[in-house]
Each structure stands twice: as C-alpha cells, then as structure tokens.
Regions:
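Basic, amphipathic N-terminal segments
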Residues: 1-17, 31, 35-36, 40
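Signature of N6-adenine DNA methyltransferases within the class I
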Residues: 20-24, 29-175
Length: 175
C-alpha cells in the first residue's frame, strides 16, 4: 500500500527517544545465521537516579521484562544498561565490559541484577577501584566516584566457579 509506505518513510526514528531499534539499526549483527548479537559490548553507562520527573519512562521500563532485573529500590541508569547488555545485546559467548559504580558489588538494590548475572552468565573478572577521596588515585580524576570494571561473558556455567576480583589501591596498583 503506497499510502502506508509514505507514512512509514515520514517517521523520523532519530527523534524518538522512547526506544532504540537495535534489530533495525544493527540488522547485520542480529540477523546472522551463525549467531545473533554483538561479540563485544564496551561502555561507560551513565550514572543517574531516575526521579519523579521520569515516572512515565519508569513505567515503560517496568513493563519490559528484560529490564525487571534492574529494578529494586532506587533505579539507576547504569543498571538498565547492564541489563540490556546481558539480556539483549550479546551473542553467545560475547563479552560485556563496562565501567560503572562500585556500589553495584554490594548494593542491596542491585541484588536481582547480580543474581541474574551469576546464574546466566560467566563473570570473567572484576576490577574494583574504591578510592574516591584522592583525586590522583581516582580512575576519573574529575569524578568523585568509586568504580569497578566488569568483564562478563554470555556463557552458561554449569557449576560453582571462582572468578578474580582485584581491588586497586589506585588506578595503577592493585592490592
């Protein structure tokens, strides 16, 4: 139908900030015969709490089953990015490497996300940078934030396993 085709072509997908069409924009990645998804996803997701001004967005996210693991207490954007990467974006055996808030490692509000990762993925390693008071020791000198770097593989692990966690005294020396 030419009229419908004309309307579809008139839609400006770049202006729509409610969703991102991964399968459309990266069809070559998600429509491969041998595997779907990215082999590696690297990022520094934003750290911000969703506030009352984001009520509509929070409702939309809560209704998406892929993001339920990011909820629990206050919703921080970085948790949504992690959930999206581990549930939607990685190919089988793909690797996710993110740098994000160190509080994730012990935060009760991130329990669901940690449980999901431990059950469904393989943690290759975690580097923790707890220093935030000394500017020279921070990973990002201008940001007073403790961070960690996770390396997570989209691979099933059939039994308990050990993964290394390195705690760094500063950005150059681990303890």
């Amino acid at each position: 139908n030419p009229a419908i085709l004309k309307k579809l072509k008139a839609i400006n997908l770049a202006e729509n900030n409610k969703f991102f069409l991964w399968h459309t924009w990266f069809s070559d990645v998600f429509n491969r015969e041998d595997k779907e998804g990215f082999d590696i996803v690297i990022g520094n997701p934003p750290y911000f709490l969703y506030q009352e001004s984001h009520v509509g967005e929070i409702g939309d996210l809560r209704s998406d089953k892929d993001y339920t693991i990011a909820f629990g207490g206050k919703l921080n954007a970085y948790k949504l990015f992690i959930a999206n990467a581990v549930k939607k974006l990685l190919s089988t055996n793909g690797i996710n490497c993110f740098i994000f808030q160190n509080s994730f490692l012990g935060d009760r509000q991130a329990t669901n996300l940690r449980k999901y990762i431990l059950k469904n993925d393989k943690i290759v390693k975690i580097d923790s940078f707890p220093e935030r008071d000394s500017k020279k020791k921070r990973v990002f000198e201008s940001v007073k934030m403790s961070v960690c770097i996770s390396l997570i593989q989209n691979a099933k692990v059939d039994c308990d396993y050990v993964f290394p966690v390195y705690v760094w005294d500063d950005k150059y020396n681990s303890s």
